[in-house]
A protein has these predicted regions:
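Phosphate/pyrophosphate-binding loop motifs in nucleotide- or prenyl diphosphate-using proteins
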Residues: 1-170
Length: 170
């Protein structure tokens, strides 16, 4: 029996909570496309749960919505190029689906940190990488469900302008 205070048990709990959060977001949505996209994410989380519980390494690469892991990384780091908007500055104007995805993205990041702590210097570091890409994929998905007029963004390369857009100069 595993000691309940180990980082592995903490990781299992976080993965379980992550799966529950996805199911909750699906349950409260009326949007079939949103529900389906979240199911794709949930399937990866379930695979990670099974791999962790059975001491198997998640070795395979994955793709979501026709994007490879490298494409997910590129799009999440260059949203203006791919989505015509800068990095998202969360705000209640983003509406329910996007706000839910933003919350989910942050929860995936928390699970990633827990996984990295649980599996320092081991073959299981792939799990950390998959979680990193999964949070990036959810970030990309957020753009799909943002209202067209949403204009709250982090602006890394331009001066702050007083145009009614909420921007933060970084």
């Amino acid at each position: 029996m595993t000691d309940k205070s180990t980082t592995r048990i903490a990781l299992r709990g976080k993965l379980d909570s992550l799966n529950a959060q996805i199911v909750f977001l699906q349950a409260v949505s009326q949007n079939p496309e949103y529900i389906s996209d979240l199911e794709d994410v949930r399937q990866i989380v379930r695979t990670l749960q099974m791999c962790e519980a059975s001491d198997e390494v998640f070795e395979e690469s994955f793709s979501l919505w026709g994007m490879s892991e490298d494409e997910i990384h590129s799009r999440s780091h260059n949203p203006a190029k791919f989505f015509g908007k800068g990095h998202i500055l969360p705000h209640h104007d983003m509406q329910k689906e996007s706000a839910g995805l933003n919350l989910l993205r942050t929860q995936i990041r928390e699970v990633e940190l827990c996984a990295c702590s649980a599996f320092e210097e081991s073959d299981y570091l792939r799990l950390c990488h998959v979680l990193n890409r999964l949070s990036s994929a959810v970030y990309i998905l957020t753009y799909k469900f943002l209202p067209e007029e949403y204009n709250h963004q982090l602006n890394f390369h331009s001066e702050r302008r007083n145009t009614g857009n909420e921007q933060i100069q970084v």
